[in-house]
């Protein structure tokens, strides 16, 4: 069972996982260093747990405890209980859904794991986290088999990407390409037809590429 700890001081060192969640550069270094990502909202927390990700801790406003009681009863990690005002002070934004979890980051797929797929979405240098999350959500909804990300593309496990994806980052396979050009060549060698999206009226339809 989780250990509930009421906290009233935003400088408490135990809250380090949740500090300044809107500071992208800070979060990028902190999350990589400590091997974590942040799940925001009860639904996202549940989906992360259902996908097998393990929590490090929780940061909750009191009114969200009962809704997550079954999850909290099943884990042995600290639950930091704070007021909603203090949560905003800690994280740097208003936590609308009042529930955050620090989860253990895992690398679940490599590019080689996706090479038997039929259809893959490839993200070239898409650096906006919400765009990456939206692409993964759309790919999952449209029945694509996975997503490959160029080396410079945004982190799918960054908080805003996870939130925008509605948790589909936990279920749809995705992997990062170590080398952009080499990765495209490998896709072609494995029999994939690589089609780039270009928003010009003169661009051919993907349908025109079928069978080519």
Q: What is each stretch, according to the model?
A:
Residues 201-212:
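Single conserved hydrophobic/aromatic residue that forms the stacking wall/gate
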Residues 101:
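Glycine-rich phosphate-binding loops that contact phosphosugars or nucleotide phosphates
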Residues 88:
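Glycine/small-residue-rich loop that forms an oxyanion/phosphate-binding "nest" at active or ligand-binding sites
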Residues 1-62:
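Boundary-proximal intrinsically disordered activation/regulatory segments immediately upstream
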Residues 67-76:
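Short, aromatic/basic amphipathic alpha-helical patches
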Residues 50, 106-200:
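RNA substrate-binding interface of SAM-dependent RNA methyltransferases
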Residues 78-81:
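A glycine-rich helix N-cap at a beta->alpha junction
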């Amino acid at each position: 069972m989780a250990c509930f700890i009421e906290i009233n001081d935003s400088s408490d060192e135990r809250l380090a996982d949740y500090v300044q969640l809107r500071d992208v550069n800070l979060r990028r270094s902190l999350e990589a260093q400590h091997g974590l990502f942040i799940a925001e909202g009860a639904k996202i927390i549940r989906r992360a747990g259902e996908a097998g990700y393990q929590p490090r801790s929780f940061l909750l406003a009191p009114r969200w405890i009962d809704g997550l009681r079954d999850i909290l009863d099943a884990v042995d990690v600290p639950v930091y209980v704070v007021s909603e005002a203090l949560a905003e002070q800690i994280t740097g934004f208003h936590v609308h859904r009042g529930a955050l979890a620090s989860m253990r980051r895992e690398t679940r797929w490599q590019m080689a794991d996706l090479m038997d797929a039929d259809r893959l979405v490839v993200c070239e240098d898409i650096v906006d986290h919400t765009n990456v999350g939206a692409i993964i959500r759309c790919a999952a909804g449209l029945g694509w088999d996975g997503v490959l990300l160029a080396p410079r593309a945004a982190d799918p496990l960054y908080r805003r990407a996870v939130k925008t994806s509605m948790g589909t980052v936990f279920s749809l396979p995705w992997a990062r390409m170590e080398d952009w050009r080499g990765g495209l060549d490998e896709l072609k060698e494995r029999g994939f037809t690589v089609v780039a999206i270009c928003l010009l009226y003169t661009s051919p339809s993907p349908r025109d590429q079928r069978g080519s």
